[in-house]
Amino acid sequence: MNGESKRIVLGVQYDGTPWQGWQTQLNGLTVQDRLEFALSKFTLQTVSTVCAGRTDAGVHGLEQVVHFDTTLERDMSSWVRGVNTFLPPSIAVRWATEVAHNPDEQDNFHARFSARSRMYQYVLYNNPVRSPLLEGKAGWVFRKLDVERMRTAAQHLLGEHDFSTFRSVQCQAKSPVKSMYSIKIEQRGDLIMFTLHANAFLHHMVRNIVGSLIYVGNGAQQPDWLKELLDGRDRKFAAPTFMPDGLYLAKIDYDPKWQLPQLEVQNFLWS
């Protein structure tokens, strides 16, 4: 049964390996295209989605947050099970909830603009020999990395800065100034996990930061080099953009007033 328009929010998880990123493209080979196709099949309506953060080709989503408007009346469990019926194995809706929505008001939930912060994780395999089992799921560096040196270097990035050095030339963000709340670097055996938490990220920002930290970790640069890069605000002096394979959109933070589900989301390589 159909009724008034309502706003539904989904928590979506996906393996980015087979997809050309999140944002819709003419070829239809994106996560957004496939999700909207599944939603349209389930609702028998045309559905347009808005996400919290657009990921590039090969980048994974542990918990992407998406909203859309619909007049369809369904309970939340039906949204999860029904939409997943039309999704491929590499994409799944993990949860669904309805948020208060008044088209005549400005203070409505928005997956992107209501987000207070984002968290990304980068998983790196540090071993002389690559692992075929981690292909597409973790980046790879064969030279031994010094985690303590990288931790020292990362401290220069904390706080509010102009991150122009770490943005791509295609970045469309209005301002390069972002607030980095924390950077955590952990090691378990041959795996190194970088966890970056900021109010927002520029295009390629995480991959560019990780690439530059690797230069510090392998001894090619000193930890203070990160401060020089930050102050220089020139992309060409930083390390090349690192591979997308190990990058995960891990968590989006919202005001508790929206009452979104708070699920424990762990990177399967780190659990």
Curated annotation (Swiss-Prot):
What residues form the catalytic site here? D56 (nucleophile)
MF GO annotations: RNA binding; tRNA pseudouridine(38-40) synthase activity
Q: Name a single GO biological process.
A: tRNA pseudouridine synthesis
Reaction catalysed by this enzyme:
uridine(38/39/40) in tRNA = pseudouridine(38/39/40) in tRNA
Keywords, comma-separated and alphabetical: Isomerase, tRNA processing
Q: Does the keyword Transport apply?
A: no
Record flagged with keyword tRNA processing: yes
The similarity comment for this entry is: Belongs to the tRNA pseudouridine synthase TruA family.
Q: Would you tell me the protein name for this molecule?
A: tRNA pseudouridine synthase A
Organism (species): Janthinobacterium sp. (strain Marseille)
- Gene symbol here is truA
